[in-house]
């Protein structure tokens, strides 16, 4: 009987964003512009790091993977949202919904681990500059990236398999713009306690601990910089750390609020807005905060442009 109930749901209906019909076109144009900005910004970073040998360093290895993760993270949800806004067809097949959830978790978790690796890289570079090359060896950097991919793959698969075992009966309306894990659990008509416990326990390992490690790394960085009597260096460091921490806090804060500390009286509108912060806004901001405004990336862009104009220039 349970298997029959589960297979009775062949698709889900995504309600999308709670916007008025007269605002549909404006919102579509806005989200399309944000998505294209995310794609172009992150693709530019990946291409520049690939083409410029000056950027073949640990920090830019992490940045290129972060850009790829951001690009994919947005592509998991935004194209479907834009499609639904255009053709007014909110349905998504059951298998596609679980697939979307899997890749959403995969690239979201991957970003979490990569942000930790980048914070550690900056911590070593600023606090132990003389030992940076020895500590951040190519083997360690590749191992950190590979470990991030492996852990996130298994974590996303765990949640997807746990979700696939649940039964979904009559209600197939998801009050969200993508197949969110918490929204799907609310629709299940079977026991979800195992899923909820796994979310809470694994969430602490995947989200809370990385967030605390990042805060600790930047705290040590600030402490180290304050010991140097240079007002210009202090201002620059606080500007950089402040911008990084603002994006990190936006990403982790919304995820912790939604999945680990959900409010009993939280509205669908509030949850949707919070989800937009880390699915749309953060991937769009990351290229500008971490890469495109720094001197190395600007220099790489100039060198690539010069080579295009003069192919014989070394």
Swiss-Prot record:
Kindly list the places in or outside the cell where this protein is found, as annotated in its UniProt entry.
Cell membrane
Enumerate the transmembrane spans: 26-49, 58-79, 101-120, 140-158, 196-219, 237-259, 273-292
Q: Which residues lie on this side of the membrane: Extracellular?
A: 1-25, 80-100, 159-195, 260-272
A GO-annotated cellular component: plasma membrane
Q: Where is carbohydrate linked to this protein?
A: 5, 265
**Top-level taxon in the UniProt lineage:** Eukaryota
GO MF entry, a single one: G protein-coupled receptor activity
Membrane topology of this protein: Multi-pass membrane protein
Major subcellular location class: membrane
Alphabetized, the UniProt keywords read:
Cell membrane, Disulfide bond, G-protein coupled receptor, Glycoprotein, Membrane, Olfaction, Receptor, Sensory transduction, Transducer, Transmembrane, Transmembrane helix
Q: Which residues lie on this side of the membrane: Cytoplasmic?
A: 50-57, 121-139, 220-236, 293-314
Give one Pfam hit by family name: 7tm_4
Biological process per Gene Ontology, one example term? signal transduction
> Is Lipoprotein among this UniProt entry's keywords?
no
- InterPro entries noted in UniProt: GPCR_Rhodpsn, GPCR_Rhodpsn_7TM, Olfact_rcpt
Disulfide bonds listed in the record: 97-189
Q: What does this protein do?
A: Odorant receptor.
Check the record and name the PANTHER family matching this protein.
Answer: OLFACTORY RECEPTOR (PTHR48001)
Report the family membership: Belongs to the G-protein coupled receptor 1 family.
Protein's recorded name: Olfactory receptor 1E2
